[in-house]
């Protein structure tokens, strides 16, 4: 496995320049927070990361609150990221968190359904056995967790975040990487604040209008333990049949 300087390489060096732009990979033992509004590209970047990690022989768990297995396969195929072999050989585990409007995981019986989402996730040992765990989107889990919501209403945001952060810290002490995607417009800033504070890598995904063109960029807010130098911004686009494309831009 390629772990130069204790990094998990994002691979695909001949496909795009994402790994190079992010300093050669994600440091082992990191919490990665990726924020962006709806449509900013959080899912596409996290899917690219997942595929790249697997191509470099890391194991990945990908939990999606939006895509089913078939939807995930269709999406990855449209980006030319063929994950079928990785799934079949158990290098990748895909999980769909079917969160219904009642704030419980669908398919659970009544007693199980009353259990807190975060508690159920933390107790799902198989999910956390991979080298890299990606939760897309983490804000959907927070919004639908009854205990978390109750503490937020009591202005106990930090207490609400404390248990899950402690759990994450235990995992990254084993060298694992946890990637969380968040739409900041859907969750209170005070609730997400503690996660921003403890993130080793904090990326903001933005859409910027330039004339009639909408450009996407990754703003690197924090990147602890980087390999090579990481720039402040990385321009990119998402292209069907190609996937993530890193773009060099000059704004006149």
Residue positions per predicted region:
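Conserved inter-motif catalytic segment of the P-loop NTP-binding fold
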Residues: 58-143, 147
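A short acidic, often aromatic-flanked loop/helix-cap motif at beta-alpha or helix-coil junctions
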Residues: 99-105, 211-212, 243-244, 252
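C-terminal regions of RecA-like/P-loop NTPase motor modules
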Residues: 1-6, 226-252
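Phosphate-binding/switch region of NTP-binding enzymes
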Residues: 176-240
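Structural signal for conserved beta-strand scaffold positions within catalytic alpha/beta enzyme cores
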Residues: 94-96, 204, 220-222, 246-248
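P-loop NTPase motor core
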Residues: 113-114, 118-197
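The Walker A/P-loop phosphate-binding site
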Residues: 1-79
């Amino acid at each position: 496995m390629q772990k130069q300087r204790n990094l998990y390489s994002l691979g695909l060096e001949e496909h795009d320049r994402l790994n190079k732009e992010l300093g050669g990979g994600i440091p082992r033992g990191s919490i990665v927070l990726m924020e962006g509004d709806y449509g900013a590209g959080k899912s596409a970047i996290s899917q690219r990361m997942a595929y790249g990690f697997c191509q470099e022989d890391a194991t990945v768990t990908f939990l999606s609150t939006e895509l089913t297995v078939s939807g995930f396969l269709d999406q990855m195929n449209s980006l030319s990221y063929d994950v079928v072999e990785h799934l079949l050989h158990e290098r990748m585990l895909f999980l769909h968190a079917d969160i219904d409007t009642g704030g419980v995981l669908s398919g659970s019986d009544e007693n199980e359904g009353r259990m807190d989402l975060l508690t159920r996730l933390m107790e799902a040992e198989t999910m956390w056995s991979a080298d890299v765990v990606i939760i897309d989107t983490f804000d959907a889990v927070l919004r639908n967790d009854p205990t978390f919501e109750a503490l937020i209403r009591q202005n106990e945001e930090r207490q609400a975040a404390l248990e899950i952060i402690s759990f994450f810290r235990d995992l990254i002490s084993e060298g694992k990487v946890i990637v969380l995607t968040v739409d900041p417009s859907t969750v209170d800033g005070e609730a997400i604040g503690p996660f921003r504070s403890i993130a080793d890598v904090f990326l903001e995904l933005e859409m910027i209008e330039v004339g009639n063109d909408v450009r996407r960029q990754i703003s690197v807010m924090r990147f602890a333990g980087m390999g090579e130098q990481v720039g402040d911004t990385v321009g990119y686009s998402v292209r069907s049949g190609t996937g993530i494309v890193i773009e060099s831009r000059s704004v006149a």
